[in-house]
Amino acid sequence: MNMINYECKMQKIKLKTNLLNFDLQSMKKFFCSIGELEFRAQQVMKWIYQHYCDDFNKMTNISLQLRKKLSTLCCITPPKFLNHKVSVDGTMKWSVVIGNQCIETVCIPKNQRTTLCISSQLGCSLACSFCLTGQQGFNKNLNVSEIIGQVWYIQKLIYFSKINITNKITNVVLMGMGEPLLNLSNVVHALRIMLDEFGLNMSKNHITLSTAGIVPALKKLHTMIDVSLAVSLHASNNTIRNQLMPINKKYNIESVLCAIKKYLYYSNANKKRVTIEYVMLSGINDAAYHAEELFNLLKSIPHKINLIPWNHFSGSNYICSNDITINNFANILIKKGCIVTIRKIRGYDINAACGQLSGIVFDRKFNKINCIS
């Protein structure tokens, strides 16, 4: 299907209600609003998320009359996926069309595990200096169907053996484009679908929300959802974090750590422990005393530390710390009793590694299109 036909199809679909926008409670309300019983929502959700069915006529345990009604009123439509790329290490990346712009989604198969890295916004407003996404500016929050549709569509490809991945998606990480906590409502609705027994029925321990630390949203997150939490800290003090992450001038390290403690107090996911993400930048944040500072920051919080070798992108002056420096940094923390992992670089050759995701984004702040390849 060419883009003109696709856009015409999407215009027609916009007149219908996209059921991918509904978690179970919203689906029940919708079914009641069209004169149907609540339990029909459960039946339809199972068809959508456990049989990957987007054709109401194939939902054989509901009446023909209801199937016709749903076909008239509703659709099951994820965003369009283009430009499927496969890395030498097996990592896969897609461009995902959002209007006339696009985001990126990455699938990482490894042994018996398949991890999907999804985006939550079209662009990102945080402008972290070491991240390519942040250089593109921000356009909009993704809606629920655009978030859950990334998981649903790739899971459907695997389910029907349309791509060379054997195991279904076991882990979802919100580590793609955008800051999830700046799109809190839509992200939470999508997470509820992933967790629901009539939805994707995933474990909360296998879903990770990664945030730069939007403190007001982080403080109330526990009242809305319980999933594993990762926080992009990337510095051992506020001076460095201000340089790397402008959001730190609004929500400094101390306020972020306080919000983390509150979330962990209520959360049962991931053994009540936060993952601290720390990008390794040569001469910036990788000295031995930075490791000491990091330990002192975190010693009152149950945590594990994920050291991330920085991935180069054009136009950046940063340099990744070398392997010796990264290992020395890790060993300092390990000797103090920290759990430390060093992230393995996946998908670098197709620009699918951490910090490399881009797309086509119309930056609303500067009123221009940013397209980085």
From Swiss-Prot:
The active site is at 104 (proton acceptor), 354 (s-methylcysteine intermediate). GO terms for cellular component: cytoplasm. Its main location: cytoplasm. The lineage of its organism: Bacteria, Pseudomonadati, Pseudomonadota, Gammaproteobacteria, Enterobacterales. Its EC number is 2.1.1.192. The keyword 4Fe-4S applies. Keywords: 4Fe-4S, Cytoplasm, Disulfide bond, Iron, Iron-sulfur, Metal-binding, Methyltransferase, rRNA processing, S-adenosyl-L-methionine, Transferase, tRNA processing. S-adenosyl-L-methionine binds at residues 178-179, 210, 232-234, 311. The keyword 4Fe-4S applies. Binds 1 [4Fe-4S] cluster. The cluster is coordinated with 3 cysteines and an exchangeable S-adenosyl-L-methionine. It catalyses: adenosine(2503) in 23S rRNA + 2 reduced [2Fe-2S]-[ferredoxin] + 2 S-adenosyl-L-methionine = 2-methyladenosine(2503) in 23S rRNA + 5'-deoxyadenosine + L-methionine + 2 oxidized [2Fe-2S]-[ferredoxin] + S-adenosyl-L-homocysteine; adenosine(37) in tRNA + 2 reduced [2Fe-2S]-[ferredoxin] + 2 S-adenosyl-L-methionine = 2-methyladenosine(37) in tRNA + 5'-deoxyadenosine + L-methionine + 2 oxidized [2Fe-2S]-[ferredoxin] + S-adenosyl-L-homocysteine. This is Dual-specificity RNA methyltransferase RlmN. It is found in: Cytoplasm.
